[in-house]
């Protein structure tokens, strides 16, 4: 029995989702008394210049580079078995070998498709358990490697896709995608209405605009929605200060109809009171929406995993997917007026959600490695005051 295993979690800063999952797992390990946990951005530490370029191209996929990203995502899927695996497997290898030699972890977890560790296992025969935590509602072959001991996935649908491409079913565990613990707490909504100056007798539309130009023509949309009676619009701009300042000038015209925020630490609070949300179809955001049963309108998904995520939620009846700017206002207004449809979407979200994914993943990993967890109780935090 390993009383205090050392855990290495490998991730990457392509969007915030992969890192957020890594941090959630880290916190869950610590809550269970496993304190020796390291989170490492392997690619960023190994090749910072190349990583910065690829991160820039990734962000551009939301605006001008959609076709380029489509070619990359689906092109890699087609040729992965041939050539790209050998190149990708060695990316970050030097830094990884140093990490393994210095830190000597007992367990390695990937929240980004990094195959350097399983490839090293294959080539050198080192014995270290490797776990992949998939962060979308689809699967790309780049996640798959024979030396991965276990895969933790979002849904039975993802499990079926993996079995179809040859992964043994017993290596795949359906747990859901790890989300922040705040999304799984019970909170009195009355406090939230007061905190954000919202009216519980009106419909609330949450727009998560993001910091990278993910959602276009936000100001024009807000102007249109402000004309809808009995509706409050809440826009979260993230770290996009220019967008925030632009919308604050609009808010002055009707501060009851439009509420503008920058970065909101406890964004789960807004999820809890919104009638529906316009956002992008990232795996983590969708998992958080499912946890709180928030109907979503998914705006112009980027080809690749976001499009696959969007199609899955659309098939399940939990999302409306909009691919044309001209449809955003009409389809959103129609949904807000259709209480039956909103309720059906909430029920669909409920059917997708699997509770406490991080806890189940950590428990499974510790059990497989005969580690002894020591639960440390954590108080439910009071409502945070940090929003700008």
From Swiss-Prot:
This is Processive diacylglycerol beta-glucosyltransferase. Gene3D superfamilies: Glycogen Phosphorylase B. Belongs to the glycosyltransferase 28 family. UgtP subfamily. Its EC number is 2.4.1.315. It comes from the Bacteria. GO terms for molecular function: 1,2-diacylglycerol 3-glucosyltransferase activity. One of its GO terms (biological process) is glycolipid biosynthetic process. Processive glucosyltransferase involved in the biosynthesis of both the bilayer- and non-bilayer-forming membrane glucolipids. Is able to successively transfer up to three glucosyl residues to diacylglycerol (DAG), thereby catalyzing the formation of beta-monoglucosyl-DAG (3-O-(beta-D-glucopyranosyl)-1,2-diacyl-sn-glycerol), beta-diglucosyl-DAG (3-O-(beta-D-glucopyranosyl-beta-(1->6)-D-glucopyranosyl)-1,2-diacyl-sn-glycerol) and beta-triglucosyl-DAG (3-O-(beta-D-glucopyranosyl-beta-(1->6)-D-glucopyranosyl-beta-(1->6)-D-glucopyranosyl)-1,2-diacyl-sn-glycerol). It catalyses: a 1,2-diacyl-3-O-(beta-D-glucopyranosyl)-sn-glycerol + UDP-alpha-D-glucose = a 1,2-diacyl-3-O-(beta-D-Glc-(1->6)-beta-D-Glc)-sn-glycerol + UDP + H(+); a 1,2-diacyl-3-O-(beta-D-Glc-(1->6)-beta-D-Glc)-sn-glycerol + UDP-alpha-D-glucose = a 1,2-diacyl-3-O-(beta-D-Glc-(1->6)-beta-D-Glc-(1->6)-beta-D-Glc)-sn-glycerol + UDP + H(+); a 1,2-diacyl-sn-glycerol + UDP-alpha-D-glucose = a 1,2-diacyl-3-O-(beta-D-glucopyranosyl)-sn-glycerol + UDP + H(+). HAMAP family: Diacylglyc_glucosyltr (MF_01280). Pathway: Glycolipid metabolism; diglucosyl-diacylglycerol biosynthesis. It holds the Pfam family MGDG_synth. It is found in: Cell membrane. The lineage of its organism: Bacteria, Bacillati, Bacillota, Bacilli, Bacillales.
